[in-house]
Structure formats: structure tokens, C-alpha cells
């Protein structure tokens, strides 16, 4: 197969600054900048699969050519890049008697930097936090090895996955002193990180109108710093839990309730604290399923506190962020034509359906 992806953004950046003495805003002409960004990705891929009795094998490879152009009014910041890369994947599965299934897999993936990671000029989030992009930032590359066991009990499923993931050129936000009382943040390829652990998942269908899924991860996390900006090579034991519930209230009404707990973790410059949050969403379909209205509330208890503690040789920065209100979104969509089979529709009804529900 072949796939083409293109993204284009052309604009400028300016900022109004608050003058406490004059009690008015004024434009900061010294931080006015223009930018142009275009990215095109040409991809070709092939997948081969075969089954021998209870053994299934699948191998694939994806070749990508990525062309990016960055233009800016900042002198010396223009960049044109071309990359050609391969991303292989291999999956081997075996089904034992009584529906016991074992699957081993390997895949190589990438995460490309977003535009604001690369914008090469100073911006401000607030009076005390300045930011600057890095036009030379590179994509992340992830090599993932997994061994999964799965057992079905009717409509219920239990699975366990052992995994090891190695990420090269990890992208992370770094913070350094900038001026009196002001820090400067920038995105950088800080080095490599490693995650080795186990994921447990239980999916239950207790009654006709309720589906519930619990996922939990426990893994050893190590980040190997290769930057000189006060970073460290350190490790931690990380964990997270997600509980998702889907309620079918009639043919056209769905309610989704989920809660997550994310444990503390180390970073190259310090650590982040644990936090938890809960979301709820209601979806109503009207006009013979052509009109869909979704009302979603994210972090309904305002518990998703972000606490980051950065400690380097020349900086100590403690950041606490707590939301004042839940985030509320209302989404309306109209389906003009639907070619999906009924079996596909039923499958979607039991999956993640609500836009804006995940953090």
C-alpha cells in the first residue's frame, strides 16, 4: 500500500505584555517573528501473513520518506530536512486448546516533533516562564518487544503482557535559568530511556448494559541522559492504573466513566509526582444515528495536579499546576453516508467512543 501525509502552517507570533504601572497592555515588537512549516511523508508498506494450523505469523515493513521545511525570521534558523527510514514489525501467535493464546511481537516506531518544538524564537507562557524551540530536534525512535498471553471466558477477557521498550533520542522539556526570576524551557533530545515491565488487563461484561475494563502497568524505568543541561542518568519504578466503564442505556444512549492513577516518575532533571483524575461522557444519537451529540467532562474532581521538581547544579524549580474547573466539551457530528456493517457498529459501541475524553 501507499500513504501520503501533508501538513502546512504559515503564520506569525506576537505578544501583548501587561504593564502593571500603566495598567494596560502593549505590544512587544522585539519578540515578533514569522514562521513557515511544511511536512510531507510518503509511505509504502507491505504485510505478509500465513497460518499453519494453530500458528499464525505476520511480518511487515514500512518505508517512509519525510521532507520538512522550516522557515523563520530568526537569522540562521531555516532548515530543510530529508529522511528515508524503515520500520519493520514481526508477530508470532499460537492458540492452545481451550482458547489460551500466546503472542510474541517486535515493532519499530517513530514520534516526530511537533511544530512548537522547533519554533526558534522566544515565547512566554507567563511572566516567569519563557520558551524557545529547537529547529535541530530529531524524531524519537522506539523499539518494542512484547510477549502477550490472552484467555477468553465467553465475553470476558484476561490478558498479561511482558514488555521491553527502548527509546532512542528521547524528546523531553529541559529548563535552565534565563534572567532574574525567569526560566527558559526548550525541547531537546536528552538521550535514551528504557521501560521493562508487565501490563495486566481484565475486560468484563457483567450484564448486558455494562462493560468494564481495568488495565494496570508496573515497570522499571531508566533514563540515560546525554545532555549537559544539568540532567542525570537515573531510574524509578513506575506504575499506572486505568478503569474504564461503558454503560448502554437503551439503543442510542451511552455513558462512559473512567478513572486513572499515574504514579511518580523520574525525569532527566528531576521527578514528577503522582496524580489521578476521572472523566465522564454522555453520547446521544438522534435522527436514525445520523446526528451524534457528545457531552464530555474531563477531570471532574479537579484532581489532575501536575507537580514537577527540577534540581540541577544551577537551578531549583518547583512547579505546581492545579485546574480550577473541569474541562467541558460538547461535540456535534452528522453522518451523511454510512458504509459500515452492523457488526462493525456493534464493535465500536463497546470501544472508546467519546471525543476529548482522554488526557
Feature locations, PLM:
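Conserved C-terminal beta-signal and adjacent last beta-strands/turns
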Residues: 234-359
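Transmembrane beta-strands of outer-membrane beta-barrel pores
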Residues: 4-8, 52-54, 63-69, 106-112, ...
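Outer-membrane beta-barrel channels and translocator barrels
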Residues: 52-55, 95-99, 142, 152-156, ...
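Residues on the lipid-exposed face of transmembrane beta-strands in outer-membrane beta-barrel proteins
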Residues: 46-50, 90-94, 147-151, 162, ...
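Outer membrane beta-barrel strand-and-loop segments of large Gram-negative receptors
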Residues: 26-32, 134, 138, 153, ...
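Surface-exposed extracellular loop regions of Gram-negative outer-membrane beta-barrel proteins
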Residues: 39-75, 83-89, 98-144, 164-185, 209-220, 244-265, ...
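Surface-exposed loop/turn segments flanking beta-strands in extracellular/periplasmic regions
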Residues: 8-35, 79-83, 116-135, 171-189, ...
